[in-house]
Amino acid sequence: MKLSLASIGRLLAQLGLTCQKPLFRAYQQNPTLVEAWLQTEYPKIRAQAKRVGAEIFFEDESGVRSDFHSGTTWAPKGQTPIVRVTGARFSLNMISAISPRGTLRFMVVRGGVGAQVFITFLKRLLAGMDHPIFLIVDGHPAHRAKSVQRFMESLEGRLKIFFLPPYSPELNPDELVWNDVKNRGVARAIVNGPRDLLRAVVGRLRYLQKTPNMVQSFFHAPETRYAAAM
């Protein structure tokens, strides 16, 4: 028996299936570790933070290139719009940390993000804080560097770092900061040079800093609501 694609589509619809854009998960992810994080590890971190008066932040790094494009624009029917952009290639790296209360701290760097850059960001994150910080990060090598460990020990309890389960970026609300910056900041800007890219990135990050309710919304996605403020 042979079926056309249209017939197959109708049969799938009758079974209650729809065509959807899938979510991608690394096959290396360990579901047991993810479940333990959601049900045991993070609740312990939250309880400990409450006991010592610490504020929880989620941190992440990302990069953006001059050739990043997304979104749509208007044009007469049948005429594909053309946006003139530079053919040059340049990029920026970004670091940010967000809290369930809606606080956002960030740093933009040219070049790689190694241990010393991460330490510089940690110093900025701690600046002006009168309470300890519990920082949740992924397994990036910079986060596990010995120099970072020594720096943390020198702070005498002002900073404590916890690690997300491996290959689990969807558990980090800070990932949604980058989605916002790239799609609502960079994608809507005309980028003709490095300064334009920097202006678009910093402008969007500063906007998010001034709108804590938007930052809080990153903790209400299906995969991140476990970390929302209580």
Give short role names for the model-derived ranges.
Residues 1-230:
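Short functional hotspots at interaction and active-site rims
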